[in-house]
Swiss-Prot record:
Residues 1-21 form the signal peptide. The gene is NAP1. Keywords: Disulfide bond, Seed storage protein, Signal, Storage protein. CDD domains: AAI_SS (cd00261). The small, basic, water-soluble napins are one of the two major kinds of storage proteins synthesized in the seed during its maturation. Cotyledons and the axis. GO terms for molecular function: nutrient reservoir activity. Residues 22-38, 75-94 form a propeptide. Belongs to the 2S seed storage albumins family. Pfam families: Tryp_alpha_amyl. The mature protein consists of a small and a large chain linked by disulfide bonds. This is Napin.
Length: 180
């Protein structure tokens, strides 16, 4: 009887350790500096070509810039800085009232290969970030907030645009300072 009890408790302890070990996963993202990485955000050469042929996702860059420069809570279709996806989920034909610039951006993203959506969005985000730095000459916390809004918007664009096989782009802004 004691052997059976020991065997059962040892088995339970083993499964507990196995389950506990699988819960804690560490995800390491390496975001190389574009100055030292000639590929930049494009680790897949095909994506670089698509980004260049799509004229650098011009509508998406304009949309990202517009969203980043808005202060306060943002447009009516966002909630506390996060996109409100309920309208997209309830209406299978997509949102009824998408702003025209966002619709153009979504059209650009739909023309991309699913594998290239995130790399091309990252390239567009970096272009907008550079544009903001040059135009605004902002420093410190204000610049960090604008750049954070650029990447937050770009991260969720695939879901907003209903891009097949891509829901979010898990990239982070590349600048010194705390990561959000």
């Amino acid at each position: 009887m004691a052997n059976k009890l020991f065997l059962v408790s040892a088995t339970l302890a083993f499964f507990f350790l196995l389950t506990n070990a699988s819960i804690y996963r560490t995800i390491v993202e390496v975001d190389e500096d574009d100055a030292t990485n000639p590929a930049g955000p494009f680790r897949i050469p095909k994506c670089r070509k698509e980004f260049q042929q799509a004229q650098h996702l011009k509508a998406c860059q304009q949309w990202l810039h517009k969203q980043a420069m808005q202060s306060g809570s943002g447009p009516s279709w966002t909630l506390d800085g996060e996109f409100d996806f309920e309208d997209d989920m309830e209406n299978p034909q997509g949102p009824q009232q998408r702003p025209p610039l966002l619709q153009q951006c979504c059209n650009e993203l739909h023309q991309e290969e699913p594998l290239c959506v995130c790399p091309t969005l990252k390239g567009a985000s970096k272009a907008v970030k550079q544009q903001v730095r040059q135009q605004q000459g902002q420093q410190g916390q204000q610049l960090q907030q604008v750049i954070s809004r650029i990447y937050q918007t770009a991260t969720h664009l695939p879901k907003v645009c209903n891009i097949p096989q891509v829901s979010v782009c898990p990239f982070q802004k590349t600048m010194p300072g705390p990561s959000y």
